[in-house]
């Protein structure tokens, strides 16, 4: 919150779900359910009815020679919603970067929402400002900024690249918070999960453990920080 410059609006800490990854936590935010309930414990999830590991974002088999999509939509029984979340999406604006807004996953979890995309933070701000000033009555907007997550994975959460990006994002959010105060609007700003730095010394490579590899019925699922092993 310090780098973002949001101390004035800070209200306290909340805890992420487990696994504390983007796939699990964003799905929890949009479904109102825990990962155990909604069924997505990681980007790479094993589904029995296809007998394969699926990358849920593009809805592709993880290990496939032609890298083709399994279908044009995710079956309803793959991701579960609370009744409240399902109703909320019917009056929701979903705002995501243009490279994410039309993915099969995004379309599924925002099935009934008005989906819009943005190319930069000016467009991001303009869309939300228009939403807050609009005469639409009671409504809800979900807006996602992935760049802190992306840069933290690449450079580390304490890197200069992350700090510079956070300052730009903070400026955008502070402007929107001030507009919200004038338009009877509440804004909740939160991360979907946190970060813990790791090192190569503390990273286990399965290639170095052939006995363990021989026990696996499938390649590891989930994600590196929370991997799931299906064993023979």
Residue ranges and their predicted role:
Residues 1-232:
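Feature captures the catalytic ectodomains and active-site-proximal regions of enzymes
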